[in-house]
Amino acid sequence: MDLPISNVLKRGSELETAQLEDEVMGVLTNITDKMALHGGTAVWRCYNGKRFSTDIDVYIWAEDFKDKFIHAAAGVGLDVTKFREKGVTFIHVKKNNTEIKIEPRNAEKYALLMPYERVDGSKINILVLSPEDLILEKIDAYNDRRAYKDLYDITILLNSVKQPCKVKGALQEFVKNIQTPDENIQSYSEFKAVIYAGIVPTYQKMVEFIKRWQM
């Protein structure tokens, strides 16, 4: 049985960030069911990842989201320090000395009801993209920025795939043309610093894992 996240995070600042993420997810799930979590936090909290993620990526297609979110956040003691709507929408939420970034995208997505693991080990049900859809997003993310973390997330998500036919073609094309990670975007040492449990795989081992999964 896995230990609670609070027992294994390496730094106090990480724990405070993770706790704030939990509070924000509580706010989101209380104000709307027209949402779907995605990105690294979805992989970490819903699909048993072991990579610390510092922000929240979420699809939101609810009306009056801004007003509802600001009001609900204030009600639980969270300070919305920035809410930018021009270009790429993002929100900054702060509590005490900890601040996180939320990137809500106004797009309706099919989502699964899944348990989200909180810092203390308890779980709440939320709506999240399927592992197959997350893999397709992560393939695009890796091709765009070539960060170790995206490749790692793919290997984690493959353990939860229920419909292999949805991703096999994309994965075959991906590994056939894959380029090595860009150390200027995320160095291997930076990648190692955010993996808090288990072996930190090399680029070669992660590609090997994906190829083996397809056999």
Predicted regions and their residues:
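Short N-terminal binding/cap micro-motifs at the start of the first secondary-structure element
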Residues: R45
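Structured mid-to-C-terminal alpha-helical surface segments
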Residues: M1-M35, N48-I56, W61-A62, K66-M215
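Glycine-rich beta-strand-to-loop/alpha-helix junction loops that act as flexible
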Residues: L37-A42
